[in-house]
C-alpha cells in the first residue's frame, strides 16, 4: 500500500539445454529451463485516495512529478505525491538570514513546478504549481528506489504533461494484491513434488 508504487513484472528467457558427460559416459542434460532477464515496470494509473492534506497531490492520467536533489543536482521522477515543507536558510547580503520553504518529498528532494524550478512555498494552504512531466519512452527508466526513477538516453524527451493534478489526494499502489498472491501460490505448486 505504498502510495505511488508501480508494480514490476519479471521477463524470462528460455535457456538452451546442453548435454554434458556424466559418470560412465552417460549424457546428462544441463540447464534450468528459464531465467529472469529483467523486470518491466507497470506505469498504469491506480485509484486515488482522498487525504485532505494540502501538501498531498495526485496525478489524474499519465505523467510524473519531478524531484530535484539539491545535494547532487539529480532530477528524478515519481508518482508519489506525498510532499511536505522543507526549510532552507538563505543568507542575505546584509548578513541576516531568511527561511525559505520548499515543497519536497520525505528525503528533502524539491518538487519542480510547471516551469521546471523548485517550488518556493509562501502560503502552505494554497495550491502549489506542481509540474507534471511526460517521458517520451518509459522503457529504460532506471528505478533508483523509493518509487523514484531517473531517465537514460533511451527515454527521449521530457515535456510538460496536460494531466490534471488533484490537491489533497494520493495515488495508491497499482499492485493487485489478490492477483499477486495467486501467482505466489501458482509458483509454489510448480516447484512442489
Predicted regions: what they are:
Residues 1-99, 104-193:
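Amphipathic alpha-helical polymerization modules
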Amino acid at each position: 500500500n505504498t502510495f505511488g508504487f508501480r508494480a514490476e513484472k519479471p521477463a524470462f528467457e528460455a535457456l538452451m539445454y546442453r548435454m554434458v558427460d556424466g559418470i560412465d559416459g552417460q549424457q546428462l542434460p544441463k540447464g534450468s529451463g528459464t531465467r529472469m532477464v529483467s523486470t518491466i515496470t507497470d506505469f498504469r494509473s491506480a485509484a486515488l485516495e482522498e487525504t485532505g492534506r494540502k501538501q498531498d497531490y495526485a496525478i489524474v492520467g499519465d505523467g510524473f512529478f519531478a524531484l530535484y536533489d539539491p545535494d547532487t543536482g539529480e532530477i528524478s521522477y515519481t508518482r508519489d505525491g506525498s510532499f511536505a515543507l522543507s526549510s532552507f536558510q538563505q543568507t542575505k547580503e546584509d548578513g541576516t538570514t531568511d527561511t525559505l520553504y520548499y515543497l519536497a518529498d520525505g528525503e528533502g528532494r524539491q518538487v519542480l513546478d510547471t516551469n521546471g524550478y523548485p517550488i518556493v512555498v509562501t502560503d502552505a494552504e494554497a495550491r502549489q504549481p506542481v509540474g507534471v512531466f511526460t517521458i517520451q519512452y518509459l522503457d529504460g527508466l532506471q528505478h533508483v528506489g523509493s518509487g523514484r526513477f531517473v531517465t537514460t538516453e533511451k527515454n527521449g524527451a521530457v515535456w510538460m504533461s496536460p494531466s490534471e493534478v488533484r490537491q489533497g489526494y494520493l495515488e495508491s499502489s497499482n499492485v493487485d494484491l489478490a492477483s499477486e498472491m495467486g501467482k505466489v501460490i501458482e509458483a509454489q505448486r510448480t516447484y512442489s513434488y
